[in-house]
Amino acid sequence: YTVENGKITAAPEGAKMEYEIVVPGGGIGDDPNFMIISMAKDALAEIGFNLIINDVSDGTVTIGNNLNAGTAELWTMAWSATPDPDMTQIYYSDVANGGANAGGSSHYYGIKDENLDNLIMEARASLDQTYRKVLYKECLDIIADWACEIPCYQRVDCTVFSSERVNTSTIT
């Protein structure tokens, strides 16, 4: 980007001065990422960049259609995973082994990284949780280097109870 006096004045070849991000909430700013995206829009506007927020009411339908058509410039979505997540669905690219085809990886990021694929398959083949954590950490480092996503929040399974109704000394 060309920057003059702290403002973007021109985009490089193949880039634009504005992009649209599709948010899959209910169309009322209720997606967990909506606030951070709104703040990013304001910050980018200060330097001359326009981020268009398309907060759709049909959520994943619009995003899914856009992703499948290859027209989504930017998008946000929450992936669900088990406590020991298998990364194949999201990041695996080897078509011969279930990537980028029906029943395999969604391949939305378009990453084709043999090292990442090998680490995913190696982790998938082990039942050792400690070993899998090490491999998944390596995978996440590679994914961060690809800069295809920005992790915005993390959910953790939790149990909520009232200590007035549950004797906490009985919890193990």
List the model feature ranges, each with a label:
Residues Y1-A15, G64-G70, I90-A125, Q154-T172:
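Short, solvent-exposed loop/beta-turn-alpha elements that line the ligand-binding surface or hinge
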Residues Y1-D42, Y131, E138:
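Append "and occasionally in soluble cytosolic enzymes with long acidic Gly/Pro-rich linkers
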Residues G14-Y19, T71-A72, A147-E149:
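Active-site lining segments that contact anionic ligands and/or coordinate catalytic metals
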Residues I21, A45-G99:
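Periplasmic binding protein-like
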Residues G25-G29, D58-T60, W79-D84, D141-I142, ...:
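Solvent-exposed loop/turn segments at secondary-structure junctions
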Residues G29-A43, G59, I63, W75, ...:
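Stable alpha-helical elements in mature extracytoplasmic
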Residues K41-F49, N68-T71, S80, Y92, ...:
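Sec-exported extracytoplasmic/periplasmic mature domains
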Residues L51-V56, Y131, L135, Q154:
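Surface-exposed patches in mature extracellular/periplasmic domains of secreted proteins
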